[in-house]
Amino acid sequence: LLNQDIDYTVHGELSVNLLDQEHFESHKEILKRDIEVSGEIKASHLVTHFGQTINNVHENKELYASHLMKQQECYAKMGEYAKSNNVTLAIENLFPFTHNHYAPLPSEIAKQINEINHPNVKCCLDFSHAYINCTHRNAHFINEIKMMGPLSEHIHMHDSFGTIERIWTYIDAE
């Protein structure tokens, strides 16, 4: 690919979750290695997922805020590391994989990315994930994507009915 006149993106592991405090250091190390690989193969962007957690953690506002702050500090540091590797992080929105999980809405992600305010920390707006999450949380889809859209340097578009756990899927995340 290096002899082609194209830009390309690496999609990092779905499992990286910087809101998972129990395995935070492992998630951070995987993200760091993804940045290194992306830089080595000259990818312009690395898509990685904004963290998600369980409802009980989200409902404890003080605990959730501390998890968000730790993730934000990590993204700021990883933004510098990405910059040194000529890579931009494209942080993708998710949806809750089950009814017991909490995935932040696009507006919540946009708020954190704006607070980080780093040229190498941007967004990947996944329209279907946003639709599923907005439907699940009864949030206004268009208003939500308007918040994240201007920060997005990469997008994902695919079909979705906007629901979770209604039919069998090949893997849970599907």
Spans of features found by a protein language model:
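Glycine-rich, proline-tolerant flexible connector loops at the mouths of alpha/beta enzymes
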Residues: L1-L2
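Active-site proximal beta-strand in glycosyltransferases
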Residues: Y8-T9, L125
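Conserved radical SAM core fold
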Residues: L14-L18, T53-V57, Y131, F161-I164
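Acidic/histidine-rich catalytic cores of soluble enzymes
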Residues: A82-A173
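Active-site acidic/histidine proton-transfer and metal-coordination neighborhood
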Residues: D20-C123
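Short glycine/serine/threonine-enriched helix-capping/active-site loop
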Residues: H11, T48, M157
